[in-house]
Amino acid sequence: MTDSFLDKLPAGLKSKVSTIIRALPSSKSVFQELYEFALNENDDSKRKMSKNSPSDICASLEPVHEEFTIFKIEDVTILSPIRKKLNLVLHISPTTKKPLLSLTNKDGGQELTIEDLNKNISMATFLPVPEKKNIFYMFINYKESVGSKYTEPVLITINKTNILEQFKKVGLIDLEIQDFTKCIEYIRKQAILTGFRMSDPFFSVRQDSDSVPSFHVEGHRGTKEGTLYFLPDHIIFGFKKPILLFQSIDIESITYSSITRLTFNVTLITKNDEKFEFSMIDQTEYSKIDEYVKMRQVKDRSMSEELKAKTANKNQQSQNEDDEQISALEAAAQQMEKNMNINDIPVDSDDEEDDGNFEAESDLSDGSDVEAEDDYAEDDEDDEDEEDEEDKEDEENDRFEHNEDQYEEKEASLLDIEHGDSVNYDDPGQDGFSVDLGIDDVPIELDEDDEEGSGVEYD
């Protein structure tokens, strides 16, 4: 017996198996058989997967020929489960003779195929595209496609103008028809012939007054923006993956939250207690949603005990925080009473009757003390300050004028001296102003022409 299988084992496993074989040599053959069995099983699994590969199954399907085609819409934009332009075709299987729904390429190759349409398709409908009147969606939900290649819903974007032209070209509708609802009616009839139904809650001209109204609103699912469609029997949110689809009968209850002046949130709660919240819905849409909820008899749990308890807990937590802040303020006030009393002035009362007559530092810039008797005390103080300032200014002006007069007298005296006149600076009549100029008396001889009253005094 060769040891080749041991060499193919991982190092750790090889060491363990070798230890067992050395202790019990007869176990070697058992390990060999086990290895070969596992190897054969793995090869069989690979072959089965290769045979059942979805891509191989779709590739093995024959292209859809015109003789087997029931109905076809060319060049429609597929948004889900793949993104490309393809043809939507209802056709007959050449082998089983049963109707199929396929998305085919320009050569007729089937890229997605759904069989057993009456059992496999659970829901199909036409939906409007918000803010695009000439575009509409075709939405088809199914259990599985051929080969289980895709399971996500089929979402197709269709241009109304293009469909009208195609239908007129192949003679499906009269050339003079411009009403797009005629195209929808024709598509719905072809769906019924192949085993499934397509609802038309938005485009049909005939609406049952007793039926649940259909509408759509804009909202967010987390960070994803989308459209929430409320249909008679379903609720859809799309169309960014994953697309959400609910049956109305599966919605146990609904709650409204985060209500503001402009928006609010809606949470759908299913019967298995799953919650799906949609946010940022416009306030103007509330009445529509509320009417839908009441007509579908969905419970509104916005005021449930659970939510009340959550709200109460939030309020209690907020109250506790406020109480803690108040307690901290009270403690600070008590500390101020103990350590910050000024001249035994009570700080716990602002009542003027308890204040009595007291003097405190003035808030004025000069720091003067005033009596706080009435509201006119400050005005009187300001008037007194202004009068004091005016008196000071008058004194300074008088002093300046006096000095100026003295200066003029000095200047006049000097001029007299230059002209030979004598000035007595020791004269007490000059307000005690005395200046020693260092000038000696000089005798002057009297001429005969000099007369009295000349203005010169002689000693």
Swiss-Prot record:
<keyword id="KW-0238">DNA-binding</keyword>
<keyword id="KW-0158">Chromosome</keyword>
<dbReference type="InterPro" id="IPR040993">
    <property type="entry name" value="Rtt106_N"/>
</dbReference>
<feature type="region of interest" description="Disordered">
    <location>
        <begin position="343"/>
        <end position="437"/>
    </location>
</feature>
<dbReference type="Pfam" id="PF18469">
    <property type="entry name" value="PH_18"/>
</dbReference>
<dbReference type="InterPro" id="IPR011993">
    <property type="entry name" value="PH-like_dom_sf"/>
</dbReference>
<dbReference type="GO" id="GO:0005694">
    <property type="term" value="C:chromosome"/>
</dbReference>
<protein>
    <recommendedName>
        <fullName>Histone chaperone RTT106</fullName>
    </recommendedName>
</protein>
<dbReference type="InterPro" id="IPR044891">
    <property type="entry name" value="Rtt106_N_sf"/>
</dbReference>
<comment type="similarity">
    <text>Belongs to the RTT106 family.</text>
</comment>
<comment type="subunit">
    <text>Interacts with histones H3 and H4.</text>
</comment>
<dbReference type="GO" id="GO:0042393">
    <property type="term" value="F:histone binding"/>
</dbReference>
<feature type="compositionally biased region" description="Acidic residues">
    <location>
        <begin position="347"/>
        <end position="398"/>
    </location>
</feature>
<dbReference type="GO" id="GO:0005634">
    <property type="term" value="C:nucleus"/>
</dbReference>
<dbReference type="InterPro" id="IPR040770">
    <property type="entry name" value="Rtt106_PH"/>
</dbReference>
<dbReference type="InterPro" id="IPR050454">
    <property type="entry name" value="RTT106/SSRP1_HistChap/FACT"/>
</dbReference>
<dbReference type="GO" id="GO:0031491">
    <property type="term" value="F:nucleosome binding"/>
</dbReference>
<comment type="function">
    <text>Histones H3 and H4 chaperone involved in the nucleosome formation and heterochromatin silencing. Required for the deposition of H3K56ac-carrying H3-H4 complex onto newly-replicated DNA. Plays a role in the transcriptional regulation of the cell-cycle dependent histone genes by creating a repressive structure at the core histone gene promoter.</text>
</comment>
<dbReference type="Pfam" id="PF08512">
    <property type="entry name" value="Rttp106-like_middle"/>
</dbReference>
<dbReference type="GO" id="GO:0003677">
    <property type="term" value="F:DNA binding"/>
</dbReference>
<keyword id="KW-0805">Transcription regulation</keyword>
<feature type="region of interest" description="Disordered">
    <location>
        <begin position="304"/>
        <end position="324"/>
    </location>
</feature>
<dbReference type="Pfam" id="PF18215">
    <property type="entry name" value="Rtt106_N"/>
</dbReference>
<feature type="compositionally biased region" description="Basic and acidic residues">
    <location>
        <begin position="399"/>
        <end position="421"/>
    </location>
</feature>
<dbReference type="InterPro" id="IPR013719">
    <property type="entry name" value="RTT106/SPT16-like_middle_dom"/>
</dbReference>
<keyword id="KW-0804">Transcription</keyword>
<keyword id="KW-0539">Nucleus</keyword>
<keyword id="KW-0143">Chaperone</keyword>
